[in-house]
Each structure stands twice: as structure tokens, then as C-alpha cells.
Regions:
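Transmembrane-helix motifs of polytopic, lipid-linked glycan transferases
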Residues: 85-105, 142, 146
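Loop-to-helix entry region of an early transmembrane alpha helix in multi-pass inner-membrane enzymes
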Residues: 59, 63-67, 76-93, 126, ...
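Perimembrane helix-loop-helix junctions
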Residues: 1-4, 149-154, 181-215, 219, ...
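Membrane-lumen/periplasm interface segments of specific transmembrane helices
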Residues: 192, 202-284, 306-313
Length: 695
């Protein structure tokens, strides 16, 4: 066995990383997204039962993920493992292609490529997720690997290479329309080859086979839906374009997106490690040499850079400039390409100190950029990379195997920083607890059981019930509860899970009061940090918020609840009415004042205060809304909300909303002050200052 491993150490490395992908699921699984992924689960279940509708939902046209997931459900039932298996298999196949593309390298080079692919946090996180991005990564990488293998003579027959290439592209098409980002890459290789009169038969066969596949695909769509372009229509009517379009946004956002936006996003999410070194071998070549790709060693570096440029600049729409939504998962297809391109660069550097100035400079740039991301793990990772690179840079050349291996292992350990943190998050996650709670206490409960919860938790529960909505209990969301017709014999449960509430994009204060406070008459069933289940006899037992006081100020007239602002009123800008209140640079606005003693007569011990202010500023990051509780000149509580949470209202106006709860027993003698703090160098303007107190 030992001799076999020594003789096949690269294959053993591949097997070890494949095992890591499997172990990551069983040890570090955190949760489902609860939205897109479980929509795929629902559609896969529909497909398995022959009920999939090709309507205006573009997810229904992603047949690769739906087909493999439906097959998994057919074989193993609808379980978390069955949902994860297809993605894990796809990830391991992609890992194998990375291994195959770097097998000719030194063992350490192959090790580095496998490490960069597997340990990029977003890639590892998605290796067991029911999402199409990993499927598109496989199709993209497979097509490029086929081209490279044919160019290098490892695939000799052009029709075999053309067929493999076409199947790979078509698989990606069936996975996600974002494959359009690979079009510039394919065109780049095609034009390069045709101008050099190379591989012409391969490209003729590839385009012919792919064209036949696409024609057959459009024919099937026409047969199924009555329109060959039904998928295009579904994508055009989806919310994706609304989320991604820059047509109605300030030009500064567009400029930011296509300049520093994506690199900074990649740095913040530790997505840059494989990408950052891939360009370095090309810096000594002329543009003509880069375009010709005459050196096989430069192929993947060239392809990676073209793919990055496409990802950054290419629009996904013909009507408006709509680049791919700036979320790392949409760009996972870059990681395997970059891993293959970067591995020989790092081997050359750590073994022979090649590219030494470029590697050091690039490491320093990314480490510096990480300091501005606000992500401590990104800072640790990239500053650590800079440290390892710097040590190798300043140490005298030493090609001893032990020294080189030490540098490679040190680099790989840095890649583990975020994955280890993710595993710890998964271990601490309450996903298994909430799943057990639902299965043991709610699924199969009384025919009269109704569970009120957040949107994602409801989706989780329906998934656990295998989407058999007729089964008990009935699930409704917080938003549906006010309109739901309860029956007299209904047993009402409230399930509050802070994790799924966050996935539902609900803040602590967005959820109703009865999700935060258990009524005295309720029957507690389960209570732990962030996960609560209780039962009440009727709807009236649910605790609801009611407004007990509202104050507003548009600064048109004096208001005794605010400090004097007569000298700050201006007609230069206003949101409503004729005037607003000006706040000087590095100064404070008029303060709203509320003695808590005025609230002690109410029945509740805790009140919820909502402050809403409209602010006109061009430096929103330099503005804070401050809520301060003072007693006898001493600050008891201090809270603030910065500009990153403000909502744009148009014309440089922003709406700031700040929520805060106060315990009246602790603050009965204190006074609340609310004001705007302008930390910037220019005057700002405020209007429609509103305070509401709820109990």
C-alpha cells in the first residue's frame, strides 16, 4: 500500500481533497440558503413527480441541477444528503479536472492547484449546496480543458474533442445562463486559432455540433412551451435584472463596479487567492504573444485573465448595462481556471524564486487592500500570505525539498483560515436543532396545528415534509398571519429561529413582537438561544405592538420636544414643506428630548422606539443618528446608526431609521436625546424627523 501511494502520490492527493469535500458536508454543513436552493429542491420534486411547469420562472429551465437532484431524490428520498450528493459529485469531478490539468506539474504544483480550488472558501462552501454555480463551473472548466488537451495533442481526433467541448458547453447552458460570461473566452481562443490557421477542423466540428445541440434544445422548448425563446422570456421577466441593472443608479456606482468594486469584493471574501497570481507570467510578454498563446504554459493564465475581464465588464443584457450581480458565488467558474494557472507560478516562486518581485508586489497590494475590507479573516489570510512570500523573498535561495515543502504547507495552512472558521460556524449552527425540533414536535402533529414563523423557516418545514403541503401542520409566515382565518379549534404554535429570520432578511425589529416575547399564558415547548417554540390557545394571546406616542417635526414651525433650531432653518433644501434644518460640518442637529418618566404609566416594562429622519448629504458615510440616555449628566446608554444602513430617497436624500428597545425599570429617571451627528466636512440638511414609541 505504501509503495502504491508513493508511486501514485498525485492521485492520493486528489483522493484526499475529494474526501475533504465529503467530510466538509458531514462536519461543517451550516444551513441551506432557504430561498433559491429550496426552490430547486421543490422543482426537482415536481420533476420527479412529472409536475414541473416551464412557466416564467427561469429556475425551471436549469435542467442539469433539476435532473440530477430529482434522480437523487428518486433514489434516496428528499433528505439533506440527497440534496447535497449531486453537488458533491459535480465538485469532485471538477476537482478531478483540476488534477488532470496539473498532473504534468511537480507533485507540489498539483498539491497547490488542488488546494487553491478546494480551499477557496466560497468554492468549498458550495460543494454541497443545491445551487447551479458549481454545475456551471464544471461545464466551463471542462470545455477549456478539452481545448487545451486538443491543442497539446492529448486528444488526437478533432471530432472527439469537438463532441466533448460541445457537451461541456451545453451542460453549462443547462445549468445557468451566466455561461454567457464564457463567450468572450471562447471567442478569444477561436479567433486566435483561426488567425493562426490552427485547429480549424476542431472549431468547425465544435461549432457544428454545438449548433445542432442548441437547435434541438430550442425545438424541445418550442414543443414544451410553444415558444423556442421561453427561457429568454423567463429570464427577462425575473428579478435578476432589477437587482443587477445600473440604468437607474448613480454613475459613481457603475464606475465603482467596473473599476475597484469586484476586486475589493473578491478580497473581502477571500476569493482572490487563486486569482491574484494568475496574471504574473503574462507581464513579461507582448500583447501579440499573449494573443497567440504559443507557449502552452501560458494558456491557463491567459484564459483566466480574459475570463476575469469578462466577469468584470460584460453585460448580461442587450438593453441595459447589467453586469453579473456582485456576489462571489456567481463567479465560481473563475476559481478552477485560476487554480490551474496559479499553481505553477507559486511552485516556481517557492522552489526557485522566479517572478519574485511580481509575487511580492502583488501580495503586498492585496494585503493592503484587505485592510480596507473590514473582514478580519481576510486581513489575517492576505497579510499571512504576504508574510510567507516575504520570508521566501528575503531568504537566500535554497532548493532543498524540505524548505520548499515547508513554504507550500505554510501557504496551504493560510488557505484553511476561513474554511476552519466556516466549519466552526457549522458546528455551532442550530440547523440540526431546529430540524429535530420540527420533526419531533410539529410534523405529524394535530390536524388543527398552525405554525407561525418566518418565510425561510416555513420553506425549511415544507422541505422536511417533502413538499406535501396537505400534511400537518399548516405553516404560515408572520406576514400571512394577520390575514389568516384561524378556526376556533386551531392549536397555534409560534416558532422563532434567529438564523432563519436573518436568512429571511428580517431584522430583530421586523418580526412581530410575539416572536420576541413569549406570552405568560403560553405553553413553552422549546427555548434556547435563538430558537424558541411555544403554543397558545388562541390568536388573542399573541403579544402585539401598539403605538403609544408619535412625535414628528418638519421644521416648518417651532416644536417644544426639540431643542432650539430657529437659527438652523433654511429654505435651500427641503423634502416636504418649504424648509429643512441645516447641520454644520462636524456638528450636531437639534435634539429630540424625551424623559422616560413620561412613559412609566404604561403597562409594559420595555418600549420599542423607532426614529426616522430624512438626511440630505453627499457624504452619507460621515453621518450618524445617535440615541443617548442620560441621567444626572451621566451617559447610561449610547447607540448610533451609521450611513451604511440608510436608504436612498433620491436627490442626495437618505432615509435613516433606527430601532432601539429600552427597559423602563432601569431608565425611569433618565432622559433620551436623539440627534444627527455630522462628522463630515460639509453641511448637511435634515427633514421629517419622526419619533414613535411602541409597547
Amino acid at each position: 500500500m505504501k509503495q502504491f501511494l508513493l508511486a501514485n502520490i498525485k492521485l492520493a492527493l486528489f483522493a484526499a481533497f475529494a474526501l475533504l469535500i465529503v467530510l466538509y458536508h458531514f462536519i461543517g454543513f451550516q444551513t441551506h440558503y432557504g430561498t433559491d436552493d429550496l426552490m430547486y429542491a421543490r422543482m426537482a420534486n415536481d420533476l420527479m413527480n412529472g409536475n414541473l411547469l416551464l412557466d416564467d420562472h427561469h429556475f425551471a429551465y436549469r435542467w442539469s441541477i433539476l435532473g440530477l437532484t430529482a434522480l437523487s431524490y428518486q433514489l434516496f428520498g428528499i433528505t439533506d444528503l440527497a440534496s447535497a450528493l449531486p453537488a458533491m459529485v459535480i465538485s469532485i469531478i471538477t476537482l478531478y479536472l483540476v488534477y488532470a490539468a496539473t498532473r504534468q506539474l511537480n507533485t507540489l504544483g498539483t498539491f497547490m492547484a488542488l488546494s487553491l480550488f478546494t480551499l477557496t472558501p466560497w468554492m468549498l462552501f458550495h460543494t454541497d449546496k443545491l445551487m447551479p454555480d458549481i454545475y456551471m463551473s464544471l461545464g466551463s472548466l471542462a470545455s477549456i480543458v478539452v481545448v487545451n488537451q486538443y491543442r497539446n495533442g492529448k486528444i488526437r481526433k478533432p471530432w472527439i474533442a469537438g463532441l466533448l467541448f460541445s457537451v461541456s458547453i451545453f451542460f453549462a447552458v443547462l445549468s445557468k445562463a451566466a455561461i454567457v460570461l464564457l463567450v468572450p473566452v471562447i471567442l478569444f481562443i477561436l479567433v486566435s486559432d483561426l488567425l493562426q490557421k490552427k485547429n480549424v477542423r476542431f472549431w468547425v466540428l465544435s461549432t457544428s455540433i454545438l449548433a445542432l445541440m442548441l437547435i434541438a434544445y430550442l425545438g424541445i422548448l418550442y414543443w414544451l412551451t410553444g415558444s423556442a425563446l421561453s427561457r429568454v422570456t423567463a429570464a427577462a421577466t425575473s428579478n435578476f435584472f432589477n437587482l443587477s441593472t445600473y440604468a437607474q443608479r448613480p454613475a459613481s456606482e457603475l464606475i465603482g463596479r467596473i473599476t475597484y468594486g469586484l476586486p475589493m469584493l473578491f478580497t473581502e471574501h477571500i476569493f482572490m487567492t487563486a486569482l491574484m497570481f494568475s496574471i504574473l507570467p503574462l507581464l513579461t510578454l507582448g500583447l501579440r504573444d499573449v494573443f497567440r498563446m504559443s507557449d502552452p504554459k501560458m494558456f491557463f493564465s491567459t484564459i483566466t485573465i480574459v475570463a476575469c475581464l469578462s466577469a468584470n465588464f460584460m453585460s448580461t443584457s442587450f438593453d441595459h448595462y447589467i453586469p453579473m450581480l456582485a456576489q462571489p458565488r456567481h463567479f465560481l467558474f473563475l476559481i478552477p481556471l485560476a487554480a490551474i494557472a496559479t499553481a505553477p507560478v507559486l511552485y516556481a516562486y517557492f522552489a526557485n524564486r522566479e517572478f519574485k518581485n511580481r509575487v511580492l508586489l502583488m501580495s503586498a497590494i492585496i494585503a493592503l487592500a484587505s485592510l480596507f475590507t473590514g473582514n478580519a479573516l481576510a486581513m489575517w489570510t492576505y497579510c499571512g500570505v504576504l508574510g510567507v512570500v516575504a520570508v521566501r523573498y528575503f531568504l537566500p535561495p535554497d532548493n532543498k525539498q524540505l524548505v520548499v515543502v515547508s513554504f507550500f504547507l505554510s501557504f496551504a495552512c493560510l488557505l484553511l483560515v476561513k474554511p476552519i472558521d466556516d466549519v466552526l460556524v457549522g458546528i455551532r449552527s442550530n440547523y440540526k436543532s431546529q430540524k429535530h425540533l420540527i420533526k419531533s414536535h410539529l410534523i405529524g402533529a394535530s390536524d388543527h396545528a398552525v405554525v407561525i414563523t418566518n418565510t425561510v423557516q416555513k420553506t425549511f418545514a415544507e422541505y422536511y415534509q417533502e413538499f406535501q403541503t396537505a400534511d400537518n401542520p399548516r405553516w404560515i409566515t408572520y406576514a400571512e398571519e394577520p390575514r389568516y382565518s384561524f378556526q376556533p379549534d386551531d392549536e397555534i404554535y409560534v416558532l422563532n429561529n434567529s438564523s432563519t429570520q436573518a436568512l429571511s432578511a428580517l431584522s430583530y425589529f421586523d418580526a412581530p413582537l410575539y416572536s420576541r416575547r413569549i406570552p405568560k399564558s403560553a405553553e413553552p415547548i422549546h427555548a434556547e438561544q435563538g430558537l424558541v417554540l411555544y403554543r397558545v390557545q388562541n390568536r388573542e394571546a399573541l403579544i402585539r405592538e401598539e403605538s403609544i406616542m408619535t412625535e414628528s417635526n418638519d421644521f416648518e414651525t417651532p416644536n417644544s420636544h426639540w431643542s432650539d433650531y430657529s437659527g438652523s432653518v433654511t429654505s435651500q433644501y427641503s423634502l416636504s414643506g418649504a424648509v429643512s434644518c441645516e447641520v454644520p460640518a462636524h456638528g450636531f442637529s437639534a435634539s429630540y428630548t424625551l424623559p422616560f418618566s413620561e412613559l412609566t404609566t404604561i403597562s409594559a416594562n420595555v418600549v420599542h422606539l423607532v426614529c426616522s429622519i430624512h438626511i440630505r448629504t453627499e457624504q452619507v458615510g460621515a453621518v450618524e443618528v445617535v440615541l443617548i440616555a442620560e441621567e444626572d449628566g451621566e451617559t447610561k446608554l449610547w447607540h448610533s446608526g451609521g450611513g451604511d444602513s440608510f436608504e436612498p430617497s433620491g436627490g442626495n436624500w437618505w432615509r435613516a431609521v433606527k430601532h432601539q428597545e429600552y427597559d423602563l425599570e432601569l431608565l425611569s429617571n433618565a432622559t433620551l436625546r436623539v440627534y444627527v451627528w455630522n462628522r463630515g466636512g460639509d453641511n448637511i440638511f435634515i427633514d421629517d424627523f419622526k419619533i414613535e414609541v411602541l409597547q
